[in-house]
Amino acid sequence: MKKIFVINGGQHFAHSGGKFNKTISNWDQEFFTDENGFELKYTDINENYNLMEEVEKFVWADIVVYHTPVWWFGLPYKFKQYLDTVFTAGHRNGIYYSDGRKLENPEINYGTGGSLHGRQYMLTTTWNAPETAFTLPGEFFNETSVDDGVMFGFHRMNAFTGMKKLDG
């Protein structure tokens, strides 16, 4: 059975109720069942969580699925806080050991000290921007994809831990 860890990064704040990302996360919970050949663990960043239990979920998972809105061209602050605190707790506890560099030559191998090799992740983002804002010449994002633009750092963060992006 594939072990799936789903994280709902949709945050309740102001006029954003986080309902759409909650709905997407609920669809995952309906699909990733034992009957379909999956084991599932789930976190909603709006609920209380234990840092070491969250670290253990990352270590346990074969695939991590992140669902998040994009606010002001980045992650909602509670989701960013979740990642910062969980990944920090995961230092030498299964998420990453070091930044990968060695004393003999500290100029190379930065970002290779992750402990989650062999695992994959998938990122879904929700926007108020139309697809054409990314694809049409002269539009706001200058023909730069979400992955190569706004979410580039997010993808590098996952690479730092050793995870690879799931194709699709």
Segments predicted by a language model, with ranges:
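Helix-loop-strand module that forms the ligand-binding subsite of alpha/beta enzymes
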Residues: 52-154
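Glycine-rich phosphate/diphosphate-binding loops that line cofactor/substrate pockets in enzymes
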Residues: 1-3, 57-58
